[in-house]
Each structure stands twice: as structure tokens, then as C-alpha cells.
């Protein structure tokens, strides 16, 4: 199982780094920060599907 530690999130500002992750909502997030903010916003219903684009 692939996991990402989102314990330091949410953050008000994310960098523009491009290291894509694919969420369980089948959406590609540009980096860990954007993904983790979405996880927090979804109350943990979004999980990591895999690294890279969906």
C-alpha cells in the first residue's frame, strides 16, 4: 500500500513543484501539498491511488 504522510497539512500555500500524484478520486494532483490539502478537505475520504499522473 502506498501512503503519503499528510500530518503537516493543510497548508495555506503550496509550491509549484511538479511531482504528480493520483488520488482515489481519479484526479491528478500536481504535488504532495495540493494532494494533502485535498485529503484534509475531504476528511480523509481521498487516498493515494499511485504516484504519477492518473
UniProtKB/Swiss-Prot annotation:
It is found in: Secreted. Glycans are attached at residue 43. Gene3D superfamilies: 3.30.60.30. Disulfide bonds join 6-36, 14-33, 22-54. Keywords: Disulfide bond, Glycoprotein, Protease inhibitor, Repeat, Secreted, Serine protease inhibitor. SUPFAM superfamilies: Kazal-type serine protease inhibitors. Its main location: secreted. Signal peptide: none annotated. The record marks 16-17 as: Reactive bond 3. Residues 4-54 form the Kazal-like domain. InterPro entries: Bifunctional_prot_inhibitor, Kazal_dom, Kazal_dom_sf, Prot_inh_Kazal-m. One of its GO terms (cellular component) is extracellular region. CDD domains: KAZAL_FS (cd00104). One of its GO terms (molecular function) is serine-type endopeptidase inhibitor activity. Avian ovomucoid consists of three homologous, tandem Kazal family inhibitory domains. This is Ovomucoid. The lineage of its organism: Eukaryota, Metazoa, Chordata, Craniata, Vertebrata.
Amino acid at each position: 500500500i502506498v501512503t503519503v504522510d499528510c500530518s503537516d497539512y493543510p497548508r495555506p500555500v503550496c509550491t509549484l513543484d511538479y511531482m504528480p500524484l493520483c488520488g482515489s478520486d481519479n484526479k491528478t494532483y500536481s504535488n504532495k501539498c495540493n494532494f494533502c490539502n485535498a485529503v484534509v478537505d475531504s476528511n480523509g475520504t481521498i487516498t493515494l491511488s499511485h504516484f504519477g499522473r492518473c
